[in-house]
Amino acid sequence: LWGNTSISAFKIEWFIASQTLAYLITALLALFIVLRNSGAFRLYWNFPFFKVLLKRSFPFAILYLLMACYNRFDSVMLERLLPEGVGAYQAGIYASAFRLLDAVVMIAYLFSVILLPLFSKMLKNRENIVPIVESAFQLLFYYSTTVVVLLIFNAEAIFSFLYDHHVAESVRVFPILITCLIPISMIYIFGTLLTAYGSLRLLNITSLLGIFVNIGINFFLIPHLHARGAAIASLSTQTIVAFSQIYLAFRALHIPLRKKICLSCVFYITLLIPIAYGVSYYWDEKVWVALLIGGVLSFILAFFTQLLPFSFI
């Protein structure tokens, strides 16, 4: 699709077909790996087990539904709260900025997939989870803050490369929206930890809180600020949910707050911002060079400020 190999007009259906094909290939590959490691198996219905499985899975399904609601309400409310034509246009502006956030969030999501079985096993065996939590926090804080700062300072060049129209409007929304990566990354750590601990009731409460906050702020800001209002609502919601889950995890699992890590985070952000600004200013016409050099310098800076300990190497 990206290679522009077709001579006919581009169709949105091509994206649907390619994504469906990608899912199918992934599913078949996963099935092949399972069969190779487990051998042949026969499918059959065990209704008592099926009933127990549904009962135990229901809280997880509710949690996923609630999280999906406060993550996706913004674009829907933009179309519904604004006049016809304006709503669709502003939803498009919001979506153009959201696509990059949706892409970079995948790294944090992969962390949560790895952390869930790890946390579950350690909690079951009554092992000390603090080192793993701290390491995950340091890595994802480094990743999220670095990506946010570098993308914000190079936003105009990136959006000019990705889009032909409405670049200025998207760039105004993007810095607010991409900052959501930081609280989302924290949610993927501490929400996963609470899930492994079995605190689904608390997680569902924080997700309900997120829905109410998101709807309330959207109702207030969208009529005045349009797409920027929706971005502010999203950032506010993610931040409130993240802090709620961090507080609940620290309280439930008695995780100590280490001042050294907090100071490292502050020093890293304080030094990263001027470095990223200087790099983007000097290589303003070579965005990929700016991102590469900024990434290398941020990696060195993370060890210099001890945000990432040398033991990680």
Enumerate the language-model features and the residues they cover.
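Alpha-helical transmembrane segments of multi-pass membrane transport and lipid-handling proteins
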Residues: I107-A108, V130-S185, I215-F219, P223
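Helix-terminus/linker motif at the lipid-water interface of multi-pass membrane proteins
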Residues: W2-N4, S8, L65-A103, K121, ...
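Hydrophobic alpha-helical transmembrane segments
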Residues: L1-R36, L208-N214, A227-L248, I293, ...
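Helix-loop junctions and terminal segments of transmembrane helices
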Residues: A97, L101-F137, S144, G191-A196
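Interhelical loop/hinge segments that connect adjacent transmembrane helices in multipass membrane
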Residues: G3-I16, A30-N71, I114, L118-N128, ...
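Membrane-proximal transmembrane or re-entrant/amphipathic helices at the cytosolic face
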Residues: G278-I313
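Membrane-interface junctions at transmembrane-helix termini in multi-pass inner-membrane proteins
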Residues: L1, A9, I178-L209, R251
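Transmembrane helix-bundle signature of multi-pass secondary active exporters and lipid flippases
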Residues: M67, E79, Y89, Y94-V113, ...
